[in-house]
């Protein structure tokens, strides 16, 4: 069983085919990898997966094309490593939430993950521009995705849902995690203009807090 968000993150990123974390800060490779991930993230956001070009990424990063392959096996591993780096920015906030009182954890977790879905540029590109990443999606091993979902569901149930629900069986709790996942995906699909329509401006912070509150109360009242 995964006990902490860091353990969950390490377990998921250890899966073959889902990218790799950067070498530890201070290592000889760290600075190069950090630059590559930063530049590659920008290229993937601008051009999508298929049109992003390794040679152009290397050029903008100021290194030789061959150097990329010393750190990342191929373009797919580089892309997923960019996703990992983006998601790793969430860890400090989620680690703090793990120390909250049980009644407060779920809502805080929802607020952070919903906010991430609205602001994480590469994740949003992957969700809202599926046609630009279709080639990548087709390459992913279904077993890897199944393991990823299983580990994430286990964490949500054990750490966030079970402590605040007492009348639900395992299937009910899995259904709740599916709802949370679908809500997060739906937010990722929202275009930025949805929050900036003339006369209908919606503060993203207010939207996130309200949605998290509704889901949190709904779960606790079941």
Q: Where do the model's predicted regions map?
A:
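Short hydrophobic/aromatic patch on the recognition helix
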Residues: 61-72
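A conserved beta-strand->loop->alpha-helix hinge within the catalytic CA
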Residues: 56, 101-105, 172-175
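Basic, helix-initiating cap at the start of DNA-binding domains
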Residues: 1-47, 51-63, 77
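Phosphate/oxyanion-binding loops and surfaces in catalytic or ligand/nucleic-acid-binding neighborhoods
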Residues: 89, 116-123, 183-190, 214-222
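Amphipathic alpha-helical packing segments from all-alpha helical-bundle domains
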Residues: 91, 137-166, 174-178
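Alpha-helical structural segments
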Residues: 31-42, 46, 60, 77-100, ...
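Hydrophobic/aromatic-rich alpha-helical bundle segments in the mid-to-C-terminal region
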Residues: 5, 123-128, 164-211
């Amino acid at each position: 069983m995964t006990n902490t968000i860091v353990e969950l993150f390490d377990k998921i990123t250890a899966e073959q085919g889902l990218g790799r974390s950067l070498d530890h800060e201070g290592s000889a490779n760290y600075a190069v990898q950090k630059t590559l991930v930063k530049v590659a993230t920008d290229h993937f956001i601008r051009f999508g997966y298929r049109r992003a070009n390794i040679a152009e990424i290397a050029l903008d990063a100021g290194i030789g094309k061959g150097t990329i392959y010393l750190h990342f096996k191929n373009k797919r591993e580089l892309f997923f490593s960019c996703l990992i780096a983006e998601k790793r920015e969430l860890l400090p906030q989620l680690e703090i939430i793990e120390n909250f009182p049980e009644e407060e954890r779920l809502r805080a977790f929802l607020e952070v993950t919903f906010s991430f879905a609205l602001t994480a540029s590469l994740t949003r590109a992957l969700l809202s521009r599926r046609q630009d990443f279709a080639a990548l999606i087709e390459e992913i091993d279904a077993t890897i995705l199944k393991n990823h979902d299983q580990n994430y569901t286990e964490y949500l149930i054990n750490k966030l849902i079970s402590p605040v629900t007492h009348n639900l069986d395992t299937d009910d709790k899995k259904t709740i995690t599916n709802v949370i996942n679908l809500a997060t995906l739906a937010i990722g699909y929202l275009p930025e203009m949805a929050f900036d329509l003339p006369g209908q401006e919606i503060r993203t912070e207010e939207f996130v807090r309200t949605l998290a509150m509704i889901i949190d109360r709904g779960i606790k009242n079941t």
